[in-house]
């Protein structure tokens, strides 16, 4: 059985590598398609993948994209390639995208254009409004609408998918994938250290006093 992971950002690598390793351990034929949004950081994370898999660069880029101009240029180059080229590797195969980034959107377009089975990992995240947290909210909604399989956790996320009237199959898991990702950094179970890690990378977390 073949499964493809279409990734571009450092967060996508961090949160999908445990799933990739699990797929490899279960003798699936894994292909990682790199969209190169954060190639410098991705290079440091790829060595966390254990076992045999196929790695494909979908576009050439050596540097992490950190400006709007660079992101727009990269996005347009990807769109042109997707529109005018075909990739038979996706056809009828499970193809995973993660989250709500531009890489998620581009990955979904790539998969659907080539008749793959689109799997959205971490589906049904909060939706404050289509343009309130743009483009994240836009990506969350439209990728969910076109996904064949939606992997999610929690009643809030499932209710959100119900509100969107998604057509794909909703698969509930027990917890967010970030818990599995903690194993990648080999955290020690040491209660003597008064330290805590807090993730506030989402726009709505940064802007919300409640969060």
Question: Whereabouts are the PLM-identified features?
Answer:
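Nucleotide donor/acceptor-binding cores
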Residues: 1, 93, 194
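Hydrophobic anchor at the start of a short beta-strand
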Residues: 3, 28-31, 53, 116-118, ...
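Active-site and donor-binding regions of nucleotide-sugar-utilizing enzymes
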Residues: 4-6, 13-24, 61-166
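Structural beta-sheet core signal
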Residues: 5, 31-34, 120, 198
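Cofactor-binding loop segments of dinucleotide-utilizing enzymes, especially the Rossmann-like FAD-
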Residues: 8-9, 34-37, 123, 201
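Conserved nucleotide-sugar phosphate-binding/catalytic loop shared by glycosyltransferases and other
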Residues: 28-78, 84
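A nucleotide-sugar donor-handling region in carbohydrate enzymes
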Residues: 39-40, 144-209
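Short, hinge-like loop/turn segments at secondary-structure boundaries
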Residues: 47-51, 135-140, 168-169, 188-192
């Amino acid at each position: 059985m073949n499964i493809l992971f279409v990734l571009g950002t450092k967060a996508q690598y961090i949160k999908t590598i445990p799933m990739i390793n699990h797929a490899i351990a279960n003798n699936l034929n894994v292909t990682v398609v790199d969209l190169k949004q954060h190639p410098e950081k991705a290079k440091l994370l790829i060595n966390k993948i254990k076992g045999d898999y196929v790695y494909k660069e979908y576009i050439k880029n050596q540097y992490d994209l950190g400006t709007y101009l660079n992101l727009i240029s990269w996005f347009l180059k990807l769109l042109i390639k997707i529109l005018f080229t075909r990739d038979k590797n996706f056809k009828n195969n499970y193809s995973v995208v993660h989250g709500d980034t531009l890489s998620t959107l581009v990955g979904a377009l790539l998969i659907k254009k080539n008749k793959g089975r689109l799997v959205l990992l971490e589906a049904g995240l909060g939706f404050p409004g289509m343009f309130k947290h743009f483009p994240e909210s836009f990506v969350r909604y439209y990728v969910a609408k076109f996904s064949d399989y939606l992997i999610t956790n929690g009643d809030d996320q499932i209710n959100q998918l119900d509100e969107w009237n998604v057509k794909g199959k909703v698969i509930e898991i027990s917890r967010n994938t970030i818990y599995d990702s903690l194993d990648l950094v080999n955290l020690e179970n040491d209660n003597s250290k008064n330290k805590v890690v807090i993730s506030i990378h989402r726009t709505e977390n940064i802007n919300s006093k409640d969060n």
